[in-house]
Amino acid sequence: MVIGVDTNSRVVDPNDIKTWPLFGDGAGAVLLERVEENQQNAGLLAWSLGSDGRGSNLLVCPMSGTRQPVTVEGVTAGEQYMQMDGRAVFKWAIRLVEENVQQVVHHSGVPMESNDLFILHQANLRIIDGIRSSLGLDEEKFLVNLDRYGNTSSGSIPLALDEAWRAGRIGPGSTVLICGFGGGLAWGCLLYTSDAADE
């Protein structure tokens, strides 16, 4: 089982009108199981994972209790809240996700247009549209739910997967590309085909 959960309401400054409206609290879980060897072309087809600490200052919560312990002075200064260089994160996300999607698609051998659905971390509609545009794909290939939930951080992909299954956008034999990205800066993309026996 893979679980993604974040309570962003605890780390986003409610007085920050640029950031507060973008985030939501959310949780989701995905149950994984082994694919039998005789089920060719099912399961995980390709993946890419990475991180680049040079961008660690672009998305931070300075007084998170690890490197900088919580203090009264820090709380008074608002250092318990997330700080983000939105423009730099935007540029990084579009470039990096597009590169990693291309890499995963290449390694999988599945043509880009043959993928049934793309589920990206629901960070920002402009980022999703920028990535979609750079890949030359139609809007219908992408699931977007951040208009209803906001950016739920690590909850966004499990929530989107659940929504896609319930809506019939993913079914037995569907090929789905998933890509997450965020603080650190870190990212992960994978391409999988649903088991024909999945329900």
Where are each of the predicted segments found?
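Conserved small/polar residues in nucleotide/adenosyl-binding loops
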Residues: 192-199
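Active-site-proximal alpha-helical scaffold in enzymes
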Residues: 3, 30-35, 154-170
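Condensing-enzyme catalytic core mediating Claisen C-C bond formation in acyl metabolism
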Residues: 16-91, 95, 99, 181, ...
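Phosphate/pyrophosphate-binding loops at sites that engage ATP/ADP/AMP, CoA/4′-phosphopantetheine
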Residues: 100-114, 164-169
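Glycine-rich phosphate-binding loops at beta-strand->alpha-helix junctions
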Residues: 115-134, 149-151, 155
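Conserved catalytic cysteine-centered active-site region
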Residues: 38, 133-161
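Acidic, glycine-rich active-site loops and adjacent beta-strand->loop/helix elements
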Residues: 4-9, 50-52, 148-150, 180-185
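Catalytic phosphate/nucleotide-handling subdomain of diverse soluble enzymes
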Residues: 162-179, 191
